[in-house]
From Swiss-Prot:
EC number annotated for this UniProt entry: 1.14.15.16
Protein name (Swiss-Prot/TrEMBL): 1,25-dihydroxyvitamin D(3) 24-hydroxylase, mitochondrial
Function of the protein: A cytochrome P450 monooxygenase with a key role in vitamin D catabolism and calcium homeostasis. Via C24-oxidation pathway, catalyzes the inactivation of both the vitamin D precursor calcidiol (25-hydroxyvitamin D(3)) and the active hormone calcitriol (1-alpha,25-dihydroxyvitamin D(3)).
Any one GO CC term of the record: mitochondrion
Induction statement: By 1,25-dihydroxyvitamin D(3) in kidney.
Length: 514
């Protein structure tokens, strides 16, 4: 019987010949300095004189016809392990390289100086990667675009409307009572679900319920009962729809979404049904709140945004929907990973407990202003987001020719900013594989701010950052006050990329009452 590998060899040899036709040789580079740009690109302190090369000279993995590097990615674990493969490629090809996955072509950046150079040249309306599956759905259902897919002045107009309420610390601090209301119920839920060893079956699902209840109370002043016995099925369906949407859109980023739509593939059907479910859940909540506060819009931030900033109802639907789905999934994910990291580092957890008790004696309820006096709490969250981020990379699309490193990149180039690579690099963090929150408090060792970007960078930074941080800080205060988070085994837990980074198995942690 012939070996399957032998059958592939003629095909591989043929593809290699096709690949090599007309392609200039690629050289490896690891230089991260930025040279002088054309006139339209503002100079930054990192630029030096010298000639640049074009994008075709960039190093990178094998680029097969039609497939790009998909074969190599699949051999290395598939899209679920692409974050690890990207880290490997940066070690092999340097701090900037080019990779094509099917129809998706991008330039990858993996150094703080390159990201700083990009930030210094950022335009008034920086562009993100075009999320074609999301756009295809909105066009298919005649829905508006939200902040994740809007561009230009339209993006700026909608962003400005929400920014007034979501990016000002004084506005976010007002939400601590609502966040604490949900956390009080969540503590009861933990008590109810713990087994005799303190373990909770499907912890991630329970954290999703907490984050869903929290963001819904903030956005709609509505509770769905997910943390009580009488749970509304609608809420569970919403959470499931988010996970389906996240797991399906990536597949249509590397293969033409137009083809999926035309053939009505199972992926397109699942993606469309998921978005239908999400919008069906959100729209009535927004309508109810707008009606409730129609006579006093200043008393409610959604009504205030709707009436004062002249957004259409469809625009409000789209923006709030994207805000809610991001809050549900990424906030729960971040809390899950920091609990895991604390369970593996009991000395860190003990120091955190001491700080919380010093600020909140007698198990007082934490307030937003209390968090200001907890630098180690903030450092723990930062360190967890560095070591185990929810999102391993973010994107930009260049809206003008830009010089990065030794290369002049044309307008329209898609950039992948590999933020997980930055956080895990020994070049940026000493003992990068260790969970050491103290590093953020050591004044004599300054950390490059462009080496840690869990919420993105520049004008398109995550608009829900301050709200997410407050939710997570308060949640940690509640949980660490009441429970010792214990690791139930010492085996490593791998991270899988399913839209965000999730654990490869149930997290081995237990909640033991103090």
């Amino acid at each position: 019987m012939s070996c399957p590998i032998d059958k592939r060899r003629p095909l591989i040899a043929f593809l290699r010949r096709l690949r090599d036709l007309g392609q200039p040789p690629r050289s490896v580079t690891s230089k991260a300095h930025v040279k002088r740009a054309p006139k339209e690109v503002p100079l930054c302190p990192l630029m030096t004189d010298g000639e640049t090369r074009n994008v075709t000279s960039l190093p990178g993995p094998t680029n097969w016809p039609l497939l790009g590097s998909l074969l190599e990615i699949f051999w290395k674990g598939g899209l679920k392990k692409q974050h690890d493969t990207l880290a490997e490629y940066h070690k092999k090809y340097g701090q900037i390289f080019r990779m094509k996955l099917g129809s998706f072509d991008s330039v990858h950046l993996g150094s703080p100086s390159l990201l700083e150079a990009l930030y210094r040249t950022e335009s008034a309306h920086p562009q993100r990667l075009e999320i074609k599956p999301w756009k295809a759905y909105r066009d298919h259902r005649n829905e508006a675009y939200g902040l994740m897919i809007l561009e230009g002045q339209e993006w700026q107009r909608v962003r400005s409307a929400f920014q007034k309420k979501l990016m000002k610390p004084v506005e976010i601090m007002k939400l601590d009572k609502k966040i604490n209301e949900v956390l009080a119920d969540f503590m009861g839920q933990i008590d109810e679900l713990r087994d005799e060893r303190g373990r909770i079956q499907d912890l991630y699902s329970e954290l999703n319920k907490w984050s869903f209840e929290s963001i819904c109370l903030v956005l709609y002043e509505k509770r769905f009962g997910l943390l009580q016995k009488d749970t509304e099925e609608e809420a569970l369906t919403f959470i499931a729809a988010i996970k389906t949407m996240m797991s399906t859109f990536g597949k249509m980023m590397v293969t033409p979404v137009e083809l999926h739509k035309r053939l009505n593939t199972k992926v397109w059907q699942a993606h469309t049904l998921a978005w239908d479910t999400i919008f069906k859940s959100v729209k009535p909540c927004i309508d109810h709140r707008l009606e409730r506060y129609s006579q006093q819009p200043g008393a409610d931030f959604l009504c205030d945004i709707y009436q004062q900033d002249h957004l259409s109802k469809k625009e409000l639907y789209a923006a709030v929907t994207e805000l809610q789905l991001a809050a549900v999934e990424t906030t729960a994910n971040s809390l899950m990973w920091i609990l895991y990291n604390l369970s593996r580092n009991p000395q860190v957890q003990q120091r955190l407990l001491r700080e919380i008790q010093s600020v909140l004696p007698d198990n007082q309820t934490p307030r937003a202003e209390d968090v200001r006096n907890m630098p180690y709490l903030k450092a723990c969250l930062k360190e967890s987001m560095r070591l185990t981020p929810s999102v391993p990379f973010t994107t930009r699309t260049l809206d003008k020719p830009t010089v990065l490193g030794e290369y002049t990149l044309p307008k329209g180039t898609v950039l992948t900013l590999n933020t997980q690579v930055l956080g895990s690099s020994e070049d940026n963090f000493e003992d990068a594989d260790k969970f050491r929150p103290e590093r953020w408090l050591e004044k004599e060792k300054k950390i490059n701010p462009f080496a840690h970007l869990p919420f993105g960078v520049g004008k398109r930074m995550c608009i829900g950052r301050r709200l997410a941080e407050l939710q997570l800080h308060l949640a940690l205060c509640w949980i660490i006050q009441k429970y010792n988070i214990v690791a139930t085994d010492s085996e490593p837990v791998e991270m899988l990329h399913l839209g965000i980074l999730v654990p490869s198995r149930e997290l081995p942690i237990a909640f033991c009452p103090r």
